[in-house]
Curated annotation (Swiss-Prot):
Protein name as catalogued: Calsequestrin-2
Location in or out of the cell: Sarcoplasmic reticulum lumen
Phosphotyrosine carried by residues: 282
Organism taxonomic ancestry: Eukaryota, Metazoa, Chordata, Craniata, Vertebrata
Signal peptide: 1-19
Phosphoserine: residues bearing it: 397, 401, 405
InterPro entries: Calsequestrin, Calsequestrin_C, Calsequestrin_CS, Calsequestrin_middle_dom, Calsequestrin_N, Thioredoxin-like_sf
GO cellular component: sarcoplasmic reticulum; sarcoplasmic reticulum lumen; Z disc
Transmembrane segments: none
Amino acid sequence: MKRTHLFIAGLYLLASCRAEEGLNFPTYDGKDRVVSLTEKNFKQVLKKYDVLCLYYHESVSSDKVAQKQFQLKEIVLELVAQVLEHKDIGFVMVDAKKEAKLAKKLGFDEEGSLYVLKGDRTIEFDGEFAADVLVEFLLDLIEDPVEIINSKLEVQAFERIEDQIKLIGFFKSEESEYYKAFEEAAEHFQPYIKFFATFDKGVAKKLSLKMNEVDFYEPFMDEPIAIPDKPYTEEELVEFVKEHQRPTLRRLRPEDMFETWEDDLNGIHIVAFAERSDPDGYEFLEILKQVARDNTDNPDLSIVWIDPDDFPLLVAYWEKTFKIDLFKPQIGVVNVTDADSVWMEIPDDDDLPTAEELEDWIEDVLSGKINTEDDDNEEGDDGDDDEDDDDDDGNNSDEESNDDSDDDDE
């Protein structure tokens, strides 16, 4: 009887827990919201939505692993479509083989990519194919390209954004032709780069902005760069941002991780791992910031900072690939072609390198004194020796064969 009472009490508690509302994570409800895009329905679908999210994929083969991988991607898209159902966003898939003509028309050339059509723009998503990352990316994309700052509290919030590129301009009003040019320029980089503006003289004074002036903030830098030759056209602003788009120190973010990784310097990245929430990681990041600030004018220097907390699924892979321990800060040089790497020796967490020691190590990397090819050369030498041995063996075999032939002739 006692067990029966406990069982009933357990069921009651379980029912009570399920009745709680407010923290229900979405699960796929089974409804199909993602459709296949074809030449026939393209115009109809395009008219229906302000924003269209397209997954361009290779034809699904009979291979079971490939089918599973495709189904996982499809479920992610279905869940994102479900979560954003109240927004004016459409979700479609384009088969590379069946719809080759349509793909060519849309300019799609990379199978497995996700593209977003918004107005006359095509934005390629270069981030982690995960539901939460995609939802945040799309929500940022449908917002206004420029965020307006009206108060000192909003200035404080603006100043706290330190780990990404941001721009802010001071204009007379939203009707100003120079603000409109700024807004048009912002659309080129949305949602990856944040554009802010103010029409408030008090805010402009606090930020040391002059009328029609735009300041460019590089990540982790104390002072902005005032874009020269104001007022600017849309084209001038776009050109300036593109020229300064590779910061001295940049954070690897889930929403644009592949774009950042592909933006290497001569085939290598200087990579730093540091957990911001960890005291040693925080200290190491502060040292990295100091090095970046002291070397911000060096066009050959760009450090990619990775917080392992942002990529829990990749930690084991990185530790195995780079042969490092990510429970402590690390900095190394990585070859993006084959993932060969060389890492600075950091004895322990209590003996982190100083900014000067870090600069000396980085100088050795940039000069080529420290590089990822040394091990390859050693392995290559071993390989050459083996090849020579093989050649010798091969020659001996030929000689033996010739001897055998002579014997047969006799």
